[in-house]
């Protein structure tokens, strides 16, 4: 029974993916993923990225956000990206494969950043979905807390933060925590985000340091 349910769910995801105009457009234009369009919509509204900036991209693979950010920050800027999964090289992006929850990986990541101060921390991290919200939501909230902790370690005063968050238990408290750390906080749901998804993006500017 559960196997049939899983198969039906997988088939629905595949159909949705191949019918998805954003996924199709990403393939046509050579973008790493449909996530490219999400950060593009956020950038159009909030202007987080500028030439010459230093940016940290957490949960970077397959590279949609890093690919987008690298075009904006240009040769005078720098993108430091990290993910558990491998990622094909992108010009202007320094990629570290590993779990930054591990001390050795975190140290290596911080070594690549320092002595620079980071202008923007981006996180598109998401846990492996088990299909059980009582398990998935705490895992997702743990990851966004880690991203916020990264801001505390590396973000320059008045820096910016954008993070994917799944609405559910812990969401309101998390937004409150972000508001305590940043001057302006907005919740974005890009058109390119699937309507049925609980994902939204918390966009925070003016880090209080």
Curated annotation (Swiss-Prot):
Molecular function terms, GO-annotated: rRNA (uridine-2'-O-)-methyltransferase activity
Disulfide bonds: none
EC number: 2.1.1.166
Transmembrane segments: none
Cellular component per GO, a single term: cytoplasm
Swiss-Prot/TrEMBL keywords: Cytoplasm, Methyltransferase, rRNA processing, S-adenosyl-L-methionine, Transferase
Enzyme class: transferase
Keyword rRNA processing belongs to the record: yes
SUPFAM superfamilies noted in UniProt: S-adenosyl-L-methionine-dependent methyltransferases (SSF53335)
Superkingdom of source: Bacteria
Catalyzed reactions per annotation: uridine(2552) in 23S rRNA + S-adenosyl-L-methionine = 2'-O-methyluridine(2552) in 23S rRNA + S-adenosyl-L-homocysteine + H(+)
Compartments it resides in: Cytoplasm
Catalytic machinery residues: 164 (proton acceptor)
One Pfam family named in its UniProt record: FtsJ
Binding site residues for S-adenosyl-L-methionine: 63, 65, 83, 99, 124
Record-stated family: Belongs to the class I-like SAM-binding methyltransferase superfamily. RNA methyltransferase RlmE family.
Matching PANTHER family: RIBOSOMAL RNA METHYLTRANSFERASE, RRNA METHYLTRANSFERASE 2, MITOCHONDRIAL
Job of this protein: Specifically methylates the uridine in position 2552 of 23S rRNA at the 2'-O position of the ribose in the fully assembled 50S ribosomal subunit.
Protein name: Ribosomal RNA large subunit methyltransferase E
Organism of origin: Vibrio parahaemolyticus serotype O3:K6 (strain RIMD 2210633)
Organism lineage string: Bacteria, Pseudomonadati, Pseudomonadota, Gammaproteobacteria, Vibrionales
């Amino acid at each position: 029974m559960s196997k049939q349910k899983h198969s039906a769910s997988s088939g629905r995801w595949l159909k949705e993916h191949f019918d998805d105009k954003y996924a199709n457009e990403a393939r046509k234009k050579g973008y790493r993923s449909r996530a490219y369009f999400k950060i593009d919509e956020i950038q159009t509204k909030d202007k987080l990225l500028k030439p010459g900036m230093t940016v940290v991209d957490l949960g970077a693979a397959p590279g949609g956000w890093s690919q987008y950010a690298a075009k904006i920050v240009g040769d005078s800027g720098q993108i430091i990206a990290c993910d558990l999964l491998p990622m094909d090289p992108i010009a202007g992006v320094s990629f570290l494969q590993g779990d930054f929850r591990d001390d050795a990986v975190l140290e290596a990541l911080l070594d690549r950043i320092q002595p620079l101060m980071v202008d923007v921390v981006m996180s598109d991290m998401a846990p492996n979905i088990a299909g059980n919200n009582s398990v998935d939501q705490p895992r997702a909230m743990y990851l966004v807390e880690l991203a916020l902790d990264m801001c505390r370690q590396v973000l320059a005063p008045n820096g910016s933060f954008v993070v994917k968050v799944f609405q559910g238990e812990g969401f309101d408290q998390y937004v409150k925590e972000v508001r305590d750390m940043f001057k302006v906080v907005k919740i974005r749901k890009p058109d390119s985000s699937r309507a049925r998804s609980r994902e939204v993006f918390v966009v925070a500017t003016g880090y209080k340091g």
